[in-house]
Amino acid sequence: YKGMLHRPNVLGEDDMLEGLIRVRQMHIRVIEETGLTSADEILYPDYYRYFSDLLSYAAVGARSTENQQHRFISSGLDIPVGMKNPTGGSFEVMLNSIAATQKQHMFMYRGYEVESEGNPFSHGILRGAVDVTGATVPNYHYEDLCRLYEMYAQKNLTNMAVVVDVNHSNSGKRWYEQDR
């Protein structure tokens, strides 16, 4: 199952148009019922425009953080964007992604040449790692955060913020481990 965007009815067929409509309705319902705007992962950069008026936070996933188009799009957003460390765990790759999104860029988007101003609110998200044996390796410990702080300082980035994602490899994908 690829998610609601691809298949809005779990038992039905793929229907991305209906998926876009349903995801948008879901975000609107959250706003109406809670008064809070949503956060979402930018899985497909070209689709962000369908939700941009409803989101107050975006994340770029571990498998997309090195993707140039994700970096370009993130550099032009007016909301905070969290760049996850890749599945291998590299802080350096994550910080390079943050540095790229904090800079101005000129790029093609939906057939147009656009220029971004850079996103000063871009920051890191620690989601743990998977080692060569397939074992999960958490990266939220004090020593990890100290190492990340030192690496952040060396890069001289605008926003030295980090979010710890307690899911994924930081909990071994076991929900009951998330609260420790």
Residue ranges and their predicted role:
Residues 1-147, 151, 168-178:
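Active-site-facing alpha/beta catalytic cores
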Residues 155-157:
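Short helix-capping segments at alpha-helix termini
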Residues 164:
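Conserved, mostly hydrophobic/aromatic
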